[in-house]
């Protein structure tokens, strides 16, 4: 690849490429695995060379694709390097989401981890609350996207992915069905509850001002 790692367009290009890879990997005719590996190796190379100004993004990309390849421990190590270098707010938030996901996959589910998990889920819940816009409110109230598990709001999508694909199954494996059900219910209903509360407050405020 002859791309400039410091190009202003590189973030968008990487995001679009990863999204395309994800979509293709879920099809029966997927031929993208070689591309995944090439992109992973490129990301690691660029990050380790130290010439890119946005090394956090490259380490994050390498970590994400390494986990996609099934190597969670190496992915976690790469993500630690992403956490250690400077990045903008967007990439810091992306790193945090991936850290929650990797921790959920690799941690021993004991009291110490549950304390950390609670802090992480509170952080994610705050992102859900503070980034809601009218489009999200409308889609949530209509209910179709949630009912059919469609992706439409990044922060809530990540909460559902982490809980449904990793955390709840891990709790079920260790026989903690109550905690699995509690968290699954939270992930399934959290956004709707938030939107309903915000809508109720908005309506009361409007009536008060009339």
List each model region and its residues.
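Extracytoplasmic/secretory-pathway proteins
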Residues: 1-210
